[in-house]
A protein has these predicted regions:
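Acidic beta-strand-to-loop metal/phosphate-binding motif
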Residues: 4-10, 99-112
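Well-ordered, non-membrane alpha-helical segments in soluble/globular domains
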Residues: 22-26, 74-90, 114-130
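Charge-rich, solvent-exposed alpha-helical interaction surfaces
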Residues: 26, 30, 123, 127, ...
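Ordered, amphipathic secondary-structure segments that act as subunit-interaction surfaces
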Residues: 80-106
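Activity-critical C-terminal alpha-helical subdomain
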Residues: 107-193
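Charged phosphate-binding loop/patch that engages nucleotide di/tri-phosphates or the phosphate backbone
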Residues: 193-232
């Protein structure tokens, strides 16, 4: 099994293979508890930097989709998924045809407090469609709602209790009391990828214990679907 990931930067997925981010660690933890080993420890993964993905997305020609118009925001998610799928097909040539691939595309939803769940669902659907268009059926959207700081706060500040309300916060860093600032206030310092990695390694952030956050539950369910399909 081989994991291909792309995110936004050092504080989530990471920027290169030897500098994994906290979201990659959480993904690996979820997978390892189901397959019995770590894909990170076995070097069975690669991180596609956001800029490389963006450059590839710019080269993608639109397909004919009569009667279906996408909003610019969801088109961004769709094209990024297609780009990651195309890069995965290139990677396939290096790792061989007999090794199952799992693709994870991380993007914060970044919705406002007034955003409805439908907007987040549209982004999820756009990523899945982008993967499928490029013949990838083992793709997994990872879209924290409104952003990954909500998941981290659930573990560190809320102690895994009453976390669903965090998904109603604004994802705008310029809003009053933004999630990023809430996390910094709780930590007493900036929530860097390195710091969050240390807390994951210390068991302070456990993806299995975050239960009542719909966006994380959706990610877990989709990843489990993919893993179940690959084990058949």
């Amino acid at each position: 099994m081989f994991l291909i990931l792309s995110g936004e930067g050092a504080a989530d997925i990471g920027i290169e293979n030897d500098k994994v981010g906290p979201m990659t660690k959480l993904i690996d933890s979820w997978i390892a508890r189901r397959i019995g080993y770590s894909l990170i420890d076995t070097n069975s993964y690669t991180i596609i930097p956001k800029q490389q993905l963006t450059d590839r997305a710019k080269q993608i020609k639109p397909l004919s989709r009569k009667g279906k118009k996408q909003q610019s925001e969801t088109r961004y998610f769709y094209k990024n998924a297609r780009a990651l799928a195309l890069l995965a097909h290139q990677k396939r040539k290096e790792i061989g045809d007999n090794i199952p691939l799992i693709l994870v595309l991380f993007r914060d939803a970044d919705g406002t407090a007034s955003s409805d769940r439908g907007e987040w669902e549209d982004k999820m659907r756009s990523i899945l469609t982008g993967f499928e268009v490029e013949q990838i059926l083992t793709g997994v959207p990872m879209i924290p709602n409104p952003k990954s700081e909500a998941w981290v706060l659930c573990a560190l500040r809320n102690k895994y209790q009453h976390c669903a309300k965090l998904e109603d916060e604004s994802g705008n860093d310029r809003s009053p009391n933004p999630l990023k600032q809430q996390l910094e206030n709780h930590l007493g310092e900036t929530g860097t990828g390195i710091l969050l990695n240390d807390k994951i390694d210390a068991g302070e952030i456990d993806i299995d214990r975050i239960k009542d956050m719909p966006s994380l539950t959706a990610f877990k369910q989709r990843l489990d679907e993919v893993l179940a399909g690959l084990s058949q």
